[in-house]
Amino acid sequence: MPRLHSASEPPATGFFARVRNELGNRTEGLHQINNQALDWYRSQSQIRQILIQIGGVVAIVIGVLVLIFHKYLIELLVIISDDWAKLPGGRLILFLLVFFVGFPPLIGYSALSLLAGMVYGFPYGWPLLASASVSGSFVAFLVFRYFLRSQGERLVNSNEKFRAFAEILREDSSLFLLVLIRLCPLPYSLSNGALAAIPELSAWVYLGASVITSPKMLIHLFVGHKIKEFGDAKTDTSTKIIDVISILVTGAAASLTTFIIYRKMQQKLHHNRAGANYDAFVFGNFDDLESGTNVELNSADFDQDNFIITDDELEEEEPNGSHTATATQVQVARRNCSKAMTICTLMFV
C-alpha cells in the first residue's frame, strides 16, 4: 500500500530538489513582477498608456538597429573617445558627470564608467572614476539625509530589496555589512538616496564602505578599454576574439560574485526574520501594550503557591482588602504565565 505524503515530512534536500525549488521561486517572482507591471499599466491614463506603447516600440527599434549596425556604433564610440581625450577640460567634464549621476533618480553611471575606460584606459581611468563616484555618492547621501529625508524614505518603500537591506542595517549597521550591500547589484543612484533614510547608518561608515568598494569600478574600466580595442580597425581578428572572451569572462565573474553576495545577504535577512518570529512566539509581542503605562507586580499578585490570582479570586478577596492587584496587573500576569508555560513546553519538546 503506497504511503501517503505527510505535511510534517521534511522537504527534499537533494540537488535537483533545490534546483526545482529555485526555478519555482524565480518563476513565481517573474509572474508577480508581470502582474505588478500590468496593474501599474492599467492604472495609468489613456494618454500615458499610448506614450508607454510608443516608448516600447522605439526601444525595440533601437535594439534592432544596434544589433544590425553594432560595428558602426562601436567605431563611432571609438571616435568619440579619441576626441574626448583631446578635449580641453575633458577630465573635469567626465568627473562632474559621474559626480552628479550619483543623485537619484539620475541614470547613466555604467555608461559613463565604460566611457572612462574607453577614453583613459585601464587602469589609468580609475583615480578619476573612483574619486568622482565616491564624492558624488557621499554628497548625495548627505543631501538626502539632512534635506530630502522624506524622498529617501519613499525610495526605501518603493523597492523590496531596499526594504530588506534597510531592515538588516537597522539591526546591524557595521562597515563590513554595508560593504557587502554596496557590492550587491542595486541601482546606483537610487541606493544612495535610499540608504540615507536609515538613521542607524552613519555617514562616515557609508563613506568608508564606498571607498573600500571602489576597486570594483576597475571592471567597468576594463570592459570599456576592451570595447575600444575591439572597435579599432588596426586590431587583428585573433586579438578581437580574445577581447570578446575576456569581456565575457569578466562580466560572468563579476555577475557570479555579486549574485553570491546577494544570496548571502538574502539568507541573512531570512535568518533575521525567522529569529524575530521565533522570539515573538516564545516571549510574546509587547507592541500591543499601551504606551506610557508602568506595570509593577508584587507579592500581592500571587498566592502562597506562586499561582497568579484570577479575577474571580480578586472579586472574592477584594472586600476583605487582602489584595490590591489592578485589572491591568492581572492581565499582564496572565500573559507572563502563558509565556512561562510556552517556554517550559519548548524545553521538553
Swiss-Prot record:
Residue numbers on the Lumenal membrane side: 1-49, 113-123, 214-240
GO annotation, cellular component aspect: Golgi membrane
InterPro entries, per database record: Golgi_membrane_TVP38/TMEM64, VTT_dom
Glycosylation sites: 25
Annotated protein name in UniProt: Golgi apparatus membrane protein TVP38
GO biological process, one term: vesicle-mediated transport
Stretches of the chain found on the membrane's Cytoplasmic side: 71-91, 145-192, 262-349
Native source species: Meyerozyma guilliermondii (strain ATCC 6260 / CBS 566 / DSM 6381 / JCM 1539 / NBRC 10279 / NRRL Y-324)
Summary of the function given for this chain in its UniProt record: Golgi membrane protein involved in vesicular trafficking and spindle migration.
